């Protein structure tokens, strides 16, 4: 149940993994430790997979090997919740915030998980004296417990923190959300109002050393938020803080008096920013000047004055400009210089009406990756290393499926339970399996692993029939590819264009493809899939197929390789083409004669636009089909008349001619053609059906 804050190598809160359970964390309910679950309400949880990220391309449903076992990048939950089995480590009970009404009572009875020690407790069960805790408002039931805060323990990457998370669109960005600070000390009186006069005298902000600041953690841009009080066994006060900084008690909520939440006292804060400098050389900022416009403020106590000095020191440290800020930030700063001159300039420079240069020597970086800054006039030159650079973005993967490594060779013998091998070799078993049907082969695949591998042999699956299935699942497509059939029937199925393209690119030995009854949207995948071994193509009764669609299918691919002089069409090697029920015209037949010259069987039945001129095109002296046609089906073509029957005598190899259901053809004319058909007479087993024995 424990949770770790995402580090530098993780993408967001969805990557929160369960840490290994230590002996110190054992307690009531500590054995049921699980990772956080989806909230099922955010934008990432309710959307579907994108199909483009490297996790989606690895999934089996998208044609990948399925080895990563990760969800889509765009479906990573942005606010994962604790599992329903989570219980308090101290009392062993689950969250009971639904049993009370008040906000304070709800907080005391809700489960909170620490991002440092991973312990899940009720805040009301903690018996801590004066302690502080920071609540993360981004992730539900997440905080830094008072115990870890009191001991000074920090997470692995406090600079990035749990607030850095990936947005709903899948891009990683800096979250501008804020957390809650929990303290049990009595509240301080409200601070004096913000002065509109010049800032207190002191060294310029850009001449004072300080750690580099990321522009996405500029907490000064957030509006001040009032405190919230929580009443329980002891009085607690929650103060809104932004990102990685907490508001100093007694400081101005509207001002930029922010300091890192792990700083314990001013000496530690200044010494961490000035390594190697003795305390007597630390330059302390001067007290603020009184403003003529502001109201009179009573003299603060010594402790309050010390806090004010500490606040102003941290303010100056935080305002050291970041050299990695973009030019757009500098432009926006220059545009708003008229309104923020008294806030962003040092007192001396504000009076002179000028701003320090951006490229001054106080901001330049040395070649060693260290920044040199003079804290004051005549002071020593200080330097410290820059902060760690953000991790580089992962390289964009190529948009193709990564195929799994080649499988190990299949065993030649069948191992038995006794340890010996079966006397029959693999070749003998395959001869036995060839007499079984698809259903019996599937039963044999469940017997043992060896038989399962043997039954995938493509010689056992010459033809696969998936017709009349509403949807094709990824396991079905993977099974087809593993068996490598020579004939595949997908008629009247809901196969999509993406699925068909995925199949055809992996079935290079496919000889027969049946797509009758499918939509043109899916059949259009034939225009981009190479089928060198295809001999039969069935496109009967496909919806919305006209001359333009057939032209797209018949024309040669536009991406011919350089140096290739011959432009072959996609159906150059097809011997049997079935186009029944399509709206074909004579223009489509001309394309067919040009780009499918090896047709021996052609089905044009129930094509409403086929008539006598179409038969003249098929049997013309320039037609390549005149010498190759063996089977011709023109049943249901109502525009055919008796005048086209003598044209069929031009086809010497014609063995079957189907003219059934042609209304304008007389049975007598068909009988005369059957009696005088070259090179021998036809026989008529049915009316208007002419057959010739080979």
Swiss-Prot record:
One of its GO terms (molecular function) is histone demethylase activity. A zinc finger (PHD-type) spans 85-151. Residues 418-464 form the F-box domain. InterPro entries: F-box_dom, JHDM1_Histone_Demethylase, Leu-rich_rpt_Cys-con_subtyp, LRR_dom_sf, Zinc_finger_PHD-type_CS, Znf_CXXC, Znf_FYVE_PHD, Znf_PHD. Zn(2+) 1 binds at residues 39, 42, 45, 77. Zn(2+) 2 binds at residues 50, 53, 56, 72. It comes from the Eukaryota. Residues 153-169 have a biased composition (Basic and acidic residues). One of its GO terms (cellular component) is SCF ubiquitin ligase complex. Keywords: Cytoplasm, DNA-binding, Leucine-rich repeat, Metal-binding, Nucleus, Repeat, Ubl conjugation, Ubl conjugation pathway, Zinc, Zinc-finger. It is found in: Cytoplasm; Nucleus. Residues 1-32, 150-420 are annotated as: Disordered. Residues 226-240 have a biased composition (Basic residues). Residues 200-211 have a biased composition (Pro residues). Directly interacts with SKP1 and CUL1. Interacts with RNF20. The CXXC zinc finger mediates binding to DNA containing unmethylated cytidine-phosphate-guanosine (CpG) dinucleotides. Substrate-recognition component of the SCF (SKP1-CUL1-F-box protein)-type E3 ubiquitin ligase complex that plays a role in different processes including cell migration, cell proliferation or cytoskeletal reorganization. Mediates RHOA ubiquitination and degradation in a ERK2-dependent manner. Induces RAC1 and RAC3 degradation by the proteasome system and thereby regulates TGFB1-induced E-cadherin down-regulation and cell migration. Also mediates ubiquitination and degradation of IL-33-induced receptor IL1RL1 and subsequently blocks IL-33-mediated apoptosis. This is F-box/LRR-repeat protein 19. It comes from Homo sapiens (Human). The gene is FBXL19.
